[in-house]
Design a protein with these regions (language model features):
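Positively charged n-region of N-terminal signal peptides that target proteins for export
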Residues: 1-5
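Bacterial N-terminal signal peptides
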Residues: 6-15
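Electrostatic cytochrome c docking/interface patches
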Residues: 17-32, 46-49, 99-125
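The feature marks the first
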Residues: 25, 29-71
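Sequence context surrounding c-type heme c attachment/ligation sites in exported
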Residues: 26-33, 58, 62-63, 120-132, ...
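The canonical Cys-X-X-Cys-His
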Residues: 28, 35-41, 93, 128-137, ...
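Axial heme c-ligation environment in periplasmic c-type cytochrome domains
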Residues: 46-52, 67-110, 143-149, 168-201
Length: 202
């Protein structure tokens, strides 16, 4: 039942996404000076608590910035940073970062096998769907549906977000609650395994 709810929710969200107006990456680059302190000059952060956003799907980046600005997503470290930017400017920023190249990372070999199994096949006994169903086998996500790129993301950040969805602290995954449903029965060890696998997935 949970798997059916998951896939129906994904279909609804994908069909509901609107097409955003044309964005200007060069104009976006000019607005990113304040972003570089945490996310690096090209969207590759140097600290695992700050997400890599280089190469991230444009529509996902835009949605997250809009959610943070409207406080639909809690992000205390970004409080006020987006307040004076309009939607077109946020679209331009998203376009710029989506065009940047994501740096590669190395993985914890002790966790990779379990992480790969969960990512590609899910956990049947817990009715947890495969992450790859929405985020693609290579972790590239789904741009039109605003499902994020996961490959190459810092494990610390991925762990923090999965735990936030699991606890309900983060809840901007839409009415379908796909991420909250998926993460609710994941153990800390399983979350860490998936995060480690994703960091080295390219």
């Amino acid at each position: 039942m949970r798997l059916l709810q998951f896939f129906l929710g994904g279909m609804f969200l994908a069909s509901a996404m609107s097409v955003f107006a044309a964005a200007d990456a060069e104009r976006g680059k000019a607005l990113t000076l304040v972003c570089t302190a945490c996310h690096g000059q090209d969207g590759n952060s140097v600290v695992g608590t700050y997400p890599n956003i280089a190469g991230q799907n444009e529509q996902y980046l835009l949605k997250q910035m809009l959610d943070i600005k409207s406080k639909a997503r809690s992000a205390p470290l970004m409080a006020g940073i987006l307040d004076n930017l309009d939607e077109q400017q946020l679209e331009n920023i998203a376009a710029y970062y989506s065009e940047q190249k994501l740096s590669s990372g190395s993985v914890d070999p002790k966790l990779v096998e379990l992480g790969e199994t969960i990512y590609r096949s899910g956990i049947k006994r817990k009715e947890i769907a495969a992450c790859s169903a929405c985020h693609a086998p290579d972790g590239s996500g789904n741009g039109p549906a605003a499902f994020p790129v996961l490959s190459g993301q810092w494990p610390e950040y991925t762990v923090a977000q999965l735990k936030a969805f699991r606890s309900g602290e983060r809840h901007n995954d839409g009415d379908a609650r796909m991420m909250r449903i998926t993460s609710m029965d994941l153990s800390d060890h399983e979350i860490e395994a998936v995060a480690s696998y994703l960091f080295g997935l390219h």
